[in-house]
A protein has these predicted regions:
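Bacterial N-terminal signal peptides
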Residues: 6-16
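Conserved catalytic motifs of ABC-family nucleotide-binding domains
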Residues: 294, 405, 511, 624
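Positively charged n-region of N-terminal signal peptides that target proteins for export
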Residues: 1-4
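Surface-exposed beta-strand/loop segments enriched in Pro/Gly
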Residues: 377-389, 589, 594-610
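C-terminal soluble interaction/assembly domains
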Residues: 416, 422-423, 608-656, 663
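C-terminal interaction modules of eukaryotic adaptor/scaffold proteins
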Residues: 665, 669
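Serine-dependent protease modules
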Residues: 21-293, 299-328, 334-339, 345-372, ...
Length: 680
């Protein structure tokens, strides 16, 4: 009986374990099917974004390549991505899931939510097409533990997908000391976070995934991935993305209402309703309405305002953001136990930083001053803030100098309120040699005068030619002499014989030991004697014939060489900087031809400076490249280069093609500049 009971128990356990295994397998199969369906629904709408970024550093505009991910959210080709991916772009290229690469235009950049809206641009004359798109889902329906898929292009590789779960659908970042909201700050200083409760998840996020969709198992976009690392990922909810998208569709921009107070939760006040006023911004609608720190706001425009916990603060700001700009709203509040109602006129919320631009001829960059900047940085509300000064240019050489952080208030005779005023003032003063500028530095208002001219290009040095042998040598030091088998050897060992020279024609060879000049022994044996032979040659007459005593393979012999004029150095060559594309070139010299082993009749201009962040550097142009042609126009000299480039600047072709000689091989360099930014 015991054996029978034991056998039955074992059979029951076996059946139970088998049922559990089958149940797990069924769940895994169902999950796999859901993942595949979600993937198939959204993957066709995934885009890989390549951007040419424009940023400002060192007093000039610079350019770099970047990238990220995005998702098509409408059949007419609207794309959602991150602001920090696309905001600085002057060129945007989107690669679709079928491999087609299209240029895109930015419709709106929204720093407050870290979202940008782009539109795909079909090729010219191409028929209209309906793009595959992914639907926006309901981020408010997400719960902790829900499965989500992070899609994107990590490390700019092809499309990928990772699986995770929602860890917290309402994540905010708090200051641990006072429980106030912390903003995310981007490289250029823009801030995001006051309006956002992020979706925290653990699907793997890598660089390049930014801007890609967070997808539920229905195949709906419930978020736009923003950042991640160490097993943590954060996405902007689709609720916010939908609001941004709809505003851009409707009006072409995103505008938000603003009252000008900092909201805090009421939990510490032992109350569940209202929102605590932590600070009131000077000259804001809230201050004008008489609102004070410590007030508890109960209703705005008749709608309850409740933020008991920090996670509810973004909802308060979102409610205010939806108020019509210019509308006068009633605000019910409580102060010291008494209830009162005040009136405030809603103003437009401003971005933290204003627009920035380069003023190339004067060598500086500047940005508009916004009210938020003025409040936090003690700047005037009107004027432009200098963000960089280029060494050697007019602002840098003025006394006193204008430096980064100064605010320009007046340029010439014109008052400066913004960048447009500054552009007009510079244009009006372009024929004026000396221009007075009034600027503010901290609490001082200073005046300076600049000379209205860029730095002069270096003049070619007027070198007089000297007698030249046409070889390079090293001193026969004692260790070298011993290695050569005769410790008593003194003089010079030939290390290079320049081509096309009299020395080459006379038969001098690398490895020859020069022991005497015109019968006079050479006594060089120390490294400091390295120029002795060169100096003795330079004191002789050009065209004179000298007799060298050399040792070759143990045999002494005499070789006669006619001295020739020393070739012009690089400093003596004509040079020019191409200001629009920001690189410098010079004529090539005979010495260049010799050292690079170019043909004796080789022509072209030699690239001498390609600054970091320039269009040339972005395209792969290098110092030492020899430019042979520009847009199929042959280049022989600096004069040819200047004439061809003047025509290029006038025509502004989408691609400037440089045909170059690099490391003894020819190659092409394709520059694709943003002419609008360059020539404004």
């Amino acid at each position: 009986m015991r054996r029978l009971f034991g056998g039955l128990l074992g059979l029951v356990l076996l059946i139970s374990l088998n049922a559990q295994a089958q149940g797990r397998a069924a769940l895994e199969d169902a999950l796999r099917r859901d993942i595949e369906q979600a993937r198939d629904r959204v993957f066709p709408a995934l885009v890989n974004i390549l951007v040419v970024d424009r940023y400002f550093e060192g007093g000039r505009a610079q350019y770099s390549l970047g990238g990220g991910s995005g998702v098509i959210v409408s059949p007419d080709g609207l794309v959602l991505t991150n602001y920090h991916v696309a905001s600085d772009a002057v060129r945007l290229f989107c690669t679709l899931s079928d491999g087609v690469r299209l240029e895109a235009e930015a419709l709106w950049h929204d720093a407050m939510t870290d979202l940008s809206v782009l539109r795909l641009k079909p090729p010219a004359n191409a028929p209209q097409r309906a793009f595959p798109y992914a639907p926006l889902g309901d981020s408010d329906a997400l719960k902790t533990g829900d499965y989500v898929l992070a899609m994107g292009n990590p490390l700019l590789l092809a499309s990928s997908v990772t699986l995770g779960i929602v860890s917290n659908p309402k994540r905010v970042f708090l200051n641990p000391f006072n429980q106030e909201l912390e903003n995310a700050e981007f490289e250029r200083g823009d801030r995001s976070g006051a309006l956002t409760r992020w979706i925290q998840h653990d699907a793997l996020i890598l660089p390049g995934n930014s801007g890609g969709p967070l997808v539920n198992l229905k195949g709906e976009v419930v978020g736009i991935n923003q950042l991640g690392g160490s097993g943590l990922g954060f996405a902007i909810p689709s609720r916010i993305a939908r609001n941004v998208l709809e505003q851009v569709r409707r009006t072409g921009r995103v505008e938000r209402g603003w009252l000008g107070f900092r909201a805090m939760p009421t939990e510490k006040l032992r109350r569940a309703d209202g929102v605590l006023v932590g600070a009131v911004i000077p000259n804001s609608p809230a201050e004008k309405a008489g609102i004070q720190p410590g007030d508890v706001i109960l209703r705005i425009d008749g709608k309850p305002m409740n933020a008991r916990f920090p996670e509810e603060i973004p909802l308060v700001y979102l409610q205010i953001a939806e108020l019509p700009i210019g509308k006068t709203v009633s605000i019910e509040l409580q102060r010291n136990g008494a209830q009162r109602t005040v009136q405030a006129q809603v103003e437009r919320m401003e971005p933290y930083y204003g627009d920035e631009d380069e003023f190339r001829t004067l060598g500086f960059t500047a940005r508009d001053i916004t009210r938020p900047m003025a409040r936090t940085s003690r700047l005037p509300e009107e004027g432009v803030q200098v963000t960089g000064v280029r060494p050697g240019f007019p602002l840098d050489t003025a006394e006193p100098k204008i430096t980064t952080g100064d605010a320009i208030l007046q340029f010439g005779e014109r008052k400066i309120r913004n960048l447009n005023d500054l552009r007009e003032a510079i244009e009006a003063s372009k024929e004026q040699e000396n221009i007075p500028i009034v600027f503010q530095r901290r609490t001082e208002t200073l005046m300076t005068v600049i000379r209205n001219r860029p730095p002069s290009p270096p003049s070619p040095s007027a070198e007089l030619p000297k007698a030249w042998l046409g070889v390079r040598t090293q001193v026969i030091t004692q260790p070298v002499a011993q290695a050569l088998g005769d410790p008593n050897l003194k003089g010079f060992r030939i290390t290079e014989v320049m081509p096309y020279t009299e020395a080459s024609k006379a038969g001098l060879q690398v490895g020859d030991l020069i022991l005497a000049l015109n019968g006079e022994p050479l006594e060089a044996f120390r490294t400091q004697d390295a120029r002795d032979l060169e100096r003795r040659i330079e004191r002789m007459d050009i065209g004179s014939e000298i007799k060298l005593t050399i040792l070759r393979h143990g045999e002494r012999r005499e070789i006669s060489v006619t001295l020739e004029p020393s070739p012009a150095s690089a400093e003596a060559a004509r040079s020019v900087r191409q200001n629009e594309l920001d690189f410098a070139v010079r004529d090539i010299t005979a010495l260049d031809r010799m050292r690079n082993r170019w043909r004796e009749d080789q022509q072209g201009v030699l690239v001498t400076d390609v600054p970091n962040g320039s269009w040339g550097q972005l395209a792969g142009l290098r110092n030492g490249d020899l430019i042979l042609a520009v847009n199929e126009q042959p280049i022989q000299t600096i004069q040819d280069f200047q004439q061809v480039m003047q025509e290029v600047i006038r025509q502004q072709p989408p691609v400037v093609i440089l045909f170059v000689l690099r490391d003894r091989e020819t190659s092409f360099v394709f520059l694709e500049p943003d002419w609008k930014a360059i020539t404004q």
